[in-house]
């Protein structure tokens, strides 16, 4: 269970120079011949900023701008141009002007330097809800040069192609910059002094980011060298976090669910290459052809074309049951071809867990069968005594209370309301666990 997709958008990056008037011929000049990428490939802007051109996208160079268009070719676009400007705000403003757009400013947020960029700033804009578009901007600086990224993208495309956008943004690097690699290098032994450095860093970050409590575990050479907590379990109370404090582990649950399936495969009770519908006839998607293609291994590959579609469990989760989750999954239509894109799906992961539970305990209630399978095949063998899907048990004794920001951006103790919505889809992200228990899982891996 990851955070919901939030305004991740296609971007239009424009190179800007304060020494010259902005006249990037993005739309006015005749477009040169476009080239479509047959596979992900490295690419550069005229000034050498590097990025990955995603498979199926079209690249055009127009003056000092690079225009990237997704396969849908519906007007969504990405333009990247390296620039020189006095500030991030100036660079972004001139970039929008060059595109002939003037979106209504909403918020600017600074991000930490990384990947060779000395300054990063992102911008959100107020877009009419019915426009169903994602509009945002990002400015990246190295020295006096800027790369500005502007987004004006259809919301559906932004969601469907989020993995491609992520790859493009995460591989956007300044000209000449080479990421550090640890290949072929040996890690220093984590002696007492280095472990104290780690502890000091974690504690400082915890304070800087107003995190009430955190627990951390480290394994080196197969041995646990750190398992401890920092801060408190609940604001306003003295009880400290330790290695046995239970936290919700969200989508880390998926890895444990997959381990349960693997144990069934090892036992000869399940086949990765069996059709999911043959294993459990109640499995359905909204598209019969896609349903027919889904094998057990595809339930957890995020490759079937089924979109994220989290609103059902977020708005109706407390009313849902495991059975209704599978019923809802049966209405979901794929938005991309089978195997075409990585599209994260919590309902598909939930189906994987519930199908595994039925293989282990045929005829049981979906949730109960899954819970029993996880206990018998994962938690008990690994000695994960504090890992559970029992929310009453989890919130007794040593556990981390939920916290969040109030309207004044102050961290406060919050209710469990939103967290409870995942219970009906629990194979995707509802387990509670501890650092000590998760270290046992990591040691097994």
PLM feature spans:
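Short, surface-exposed loop or secondary-structure junction motifs
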Residues: 223, 227-230, 234, 287-445
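Extracytoplasmic/secreted envelope proteins and their assembly/folding machinery
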Residues: 54, 65, 89-96, 162-169, ...
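Signal peptide processing junction and immediate N-terminal pro/mature segment
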Residues: 20-34
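Surface-exposed amphipathic alpha-helical segments
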Residues: 32-34, 57, 145-189, 193
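Conserved polar/disulfide-associated segments of primarily extracytoplasmic proteins
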Residues: 34-39, 47, 59-157
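Bacterial N-terminal signal peptides
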Residues: 9-21
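Short active-site loop at a secondary-structure junction
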Residues: 208-215, 237-299, 334-347, 426-429
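Short, conserved catalytic-motif segment at the N-terminal edge
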Residues: 190-191, 195-249, 269-271, 278-279, ...
